[in-house]
Amino acid sequence: MLDKVKNVIVVLSGKGGVGKSTVSTQLSLALRKNGFKVGLLDIDLCGPSVPYLLGLEGRDIFQCDDGWVPVYTDESQTLAVMSIGFLLKNREDPVIWRGPKKTMMIRQFLTDVRWDELDYLIIDTPPGTSDEHITVMECLKEVGCHGAIIVTTPQEVALDDVRKEITFCKKTGINILGIVENMSGFVCPHCTSCTNIFSSNGGVSLATYAQVPHLGTLPIDPRVGILAGTTTSVLDELPDSTTAEVLTHIVEKLKTMLVS
């Protein structure tokens, strides 16, 4: 039930472990900070991270006549979250499903969740170009996917896989809103200087190659990691950080590219 959603954005990456879920959660919190009503849908069925990252583990999902009611992070219901993590009895329980069952669950998430009026629905996806991604694109044909944000790290091994994700987007007709380079440099927690411990500018070169916007470069910042398990936005806790600056830039870009 996405008829009340103005903008649907999928967050993709061809490589696992690039911080895609962290980008999804902090982007959702940044959009909320800017006065938008936001939904965050975690369709990484085998590795749902969103409930943990927002400190929502153990929360219950309820059903009403219109379908599943998402978990809200605040009383004003400005951020709604849905994840298979809420349906598992134990965080360590594996999801051992074949493709058809995964497809059915994702279709339920996209059609049977009672999203109220939302300015943005952020969909956090698993890595790669699997059944899950194809199902999402098929289900979004009616309401439309307004674009994808692709997350990468600067290493060449990640960039190779992300190039495949770009090809997937082009073949399925997904508009690429831009590329975010994550884990580029390390921010010292004491002096806040940033040191490039890996190669750098991989996201910039990839954006140039794909002819899409480069939305920003995020460093490894231990202070941001401490926020995991809370609903605190980087914009509130670390307003002067590079991460907050980049997230603010992404929000401003989305406001100009999409319907507010």
From Swiss-Prot:
ATP binds at G14, K15, G16, G17, V18, G19, K20, S21. GO terms for cellular component: cytosol; cytosolic [4Fe-4S] assembly scaffold complex. It is found in: Cytoplasm. Binds 4 [4Fe-4S] clusters per heterotetramer. Contains two stable clusters in the N-termini of Nubp1 and two labile, bridging clusters between subunits of the Nubp1-Nubp2 heterotetramer. Its cofactor is [4Fe-4S] cluster. One of its GO terms (molecular function) is ATP binding. Pfam families: ParA. SUPFAM superfamilies: P-loop containing nucleoside triphosphate hydrolases. Its main location: cytoplasm. Signal peptide: none annotated. InterPro entries: Mrp-like_CS, Mrp/NBP35_ATP-bd, NUBP2/Cfd1_eukaryotes, P-loop_NTPase, YlxH/NBP35. It comes from the Eukaryota. [4Fe-4S] cluster binds at C188, C191. Keywords: 4Fe-4S, ATP-binding, Cytoplasm, Iron, Iron-sulfur, Metal-binding, Nucleotide-binding. Coiled coil: none annotated. GO terms for biological process: iron-sulfur cluster assembly. Heterotetramer of 2 Nubp1 and 2 Nubp2 chains. Component of the cytosolic iron-sulfur (Fe/S) protein assembly (CIA) machinery. Required for maturation of extramitochondrial Fe-S proteins. The Nubp1-Nubp2 heterotetramer forms a Fe-S scaffold complex, mediating the de novo assembly of an Fe-S cluster and its transfer to target apoproteins. HAMAP family: Mrp_NBP35, NUBP2. Belongs to the Mrp/NBP35 ATP-binding proteins family. NUBP2/CFD1 subfamily. This is Cytosolic Fe-S cluster assembly factor Nubp2 homolog. The lineage of its organism: Eukaryota, Metazoa, Ecdysozoa, Arthropoda, Hexapoda.
